[in-house]
Each structure stands twice: as structure tokens, then as C-alpha cells.
UniProtKB/Swiss-Prot annotation:
It comes from Geobacillus stearothermophilus. Pathway: Glycan degradation; xylan degradation. GO terms for molecular function: endo-1,4-beta-xylanase activity. Its EC number is 3.2.1.8. The keyword Hydrolase applies. It comes from the Bacteria. Residues 1-19 form the signal peptide. This is Endo-1,4-beta-xylanase A. Belongs to the glycosyl hydrolase 11 (cellulase G) family. The gene is xynA.
Amino acid sequence: MKLKKKMLTLLLTASMSFGLFGATSSAATDYWQYWTDGGGMVNAVNGPGGNYSVTWQNTGNFVVGKGWTVGSPNRVINYNAGIWEPSGNGYLTLYGWTRNALIEYYVVDSWGTYRPTGNYKGTVNSDGGTYDIYTTMRYNAPSIDGTQTFQQFWSVRQSKRPTGSNVSITFSNHVNAWRSKGMNLGSSWAYQVLATEGYQSSGRSNVTVW
């Protein structure tokens, strides 16, 4: 399954330095992501602070999440998924884009019936788990810059991460591992969110991000 999405917002960017990246603390969330292709029912609530909730039924594709207008390779993303109950295809994932080059990236902590795969590159150990690293290609597909051909970078946890407690994604671990495999993110950063994504499925989630 390759989930399709088209973002409707013009996004700010920031420059990325070269070399290995280290973790830094996060500023408060400032970005609310809500997109649906119009299929089925998606009821998303932009809660206070970093909280959001979404209930979906018989959907096409949607992406809902909270995070930051400008992404960072150094960010530690903290979150608590108090509810994560997909029935069918869905991801609980760090999600974002870079430009120059145009890259769509995922760090998937949990999923529904489908665990994403691709061109296998190796593994990275981070935050108490082991993630498989993949690349995939999208051809003439929707992107933050309209219809484009671009790469996707993936880190997918080998086992679903337990939910209901405070956990972290140290993104620099993934960025450095990707770079060691020749997977170089772009030099400018669009948004970065901790997202619930669903495709032809139903379910509900309630997530707080900081």
C-alpha cells in the first residue's frame, strides 16, 4: 500500500546543517495537520496544547496530526497515544517533508493490519526499539509541491510500540542512520508532525504531542 496525500498549505522552511545531528529539546507545537481525500468519515478535533483526537470510519486516505511548522533533524518528539485503535490500514508515525531534495519521511511506531516495507537498507536502534530502514519511490504523485516524483524514507519499528504512556522519538538517530545508508534528506524543512494516518479503514486515536 502506498498512501497518497496532497497538502493544501504553503509551508515555511528552514536550513539544515551538514554532519551528524544531535538531539535537542522541542518547542511547543505550532502546526495542526488535517487532510482527507474525502472518502468516508473523518472526525478530527484540534485539542488544547499538543492534543488531538480523530475518529474515522470507512475512509479513503487521511492524515491528522500535531507538530511543528518547521521540521528539524535534531528534534526529540515526545508523545502519549492514550488511544490508538485502528481497524485496517493505519500508521502512528512521525511524518514530514523536506525540500531540496523533495523527500517524504516516516518514523512508524505502530500500525494496523499493514506494516509498511520497501527497499530494505538496514536497521537503527533508537528509544528502546529496533527499526527497519526502507526507501520507496513515488512517481507523479501528490506532494507539498504539487504532482512530483520523489523518494520516501522510512524507519519502521520491528514490533508495534506499546501505547498509553509517555514515549519519545529521537529523530536525529534516524537521520544519522539514514545518512549512513546514503539517504540524504533535503536542505530545507517543511512541517513535521506526530500523525495518525489511515487508508481504507476505521478506528480512533487520541494523541498528545510535545
